[in-house]
């Protein structure tokens, strides 16, 4: 019937699927669907616990926050791994984390926390460096 008002073709339709015979789909977590390693469900639970007045938290918000946390963690670990490799050790210590974070300008402004056992960055004032270099040049000219 031309108007779309009429009986269906009968039987069960495939619902737009290409093959009618498929088993049940395997369950995937939100993290697996988003291609993340960090747990979206746990982050969503923390977001719900820390909001005031029992606010609702959308699933996409939790995925977004999880992706940001995962990216920042990967960035810090990559820089800390490079710092450890430069010092020819295989284990990342708080000192390597400190060197990595303070060495990157954007991470330094983001993470203003004090890192336990991180030490301090080596820094010598330029005025002092100039005096030392001038003395070395004077000794080199005398010799």
Curated annotation (Swiss-Prot):
Q: What is its main location?
A: nucleus
> Which is a Pfam family this sequence falls into?
Histone
- Could you describe the post-translational modifications of this protein? Acetylated once deposited into chromatin.
For region Disordered, the annotated ranges are: 1-37
**Positions of post-translational N6-acetyllysine modification:** 5, 12
Where is this protein found? Nucleus; Chromosome
Q: Which UniProt key words apply to this protein?
A: Acetylation, Activator, Chromatin regulator, Chromosome, DNA-binding, Nucleosome core, Nucleus, Transcription, Transcription regulation
Q: Which GO terms describe its biological process?
A: CENP-A eviction from euchromatin; heterochromatin formation; nuclear-transcribed mRNA catabolic process, non-stop decay; regulation of transcription by RNA polymerase II; silent mating-type cassette heterochromatin formation; transcription elongation by RNA polymerase II
> Could you tell me the superkingdom of the organism this chain comes from?
Eukaryota
Which cellular component appears as one GO term in the record?
A: nucleus
Stretches of Gly residues bias are at 1-18
- GO molecular function list: chromatin DNA binding; identical protein binding; protein heterodimerization activity; RNA polymerase II cis-regulatory region sequence-specific DNA binding; structural constituent of chromatin
Briefly, what is this protein's role?
Variant histone H2A which can replace H2A in some nucleosomes. Nucleosomes wrap and compact DNA into chromatin, limiting DNA accessibility to the cellular machineries which require DNA as a template. Histones thereby play a central role in transcription regulation, DNA repair, DNA replication and chromosomal stability. DNA accessibility is regulated via a complex set of post-translational modifications of histones, also called histone code, and nucleosome remodeling.
PANTHER family, per database record: HISTONE H2A
Its subunit composition reads: The nucleosome is a histone octamer containing two molecules each of H2A, H2B, H3 and H4 assembled in one H3-H4 heterotetramer and two H2A-H2B heterodimers. The octamer wraps approximately 147 bp of DNA. H2A or its variant H2A.Z forms a heterodimer with H2B. H2A.Z associates with the vps72/swc2 subunit of the SWR1 chromatin remodeling complex. Also interacts with rpo-9/rpb1/DNA-directed RNA polymerase II largest subunit.
Query: What is stated as this protein's family in its record?
Result: Belongs to the histone H2A family.
Q: What's this protein's name?
A: Histone H2A.Z
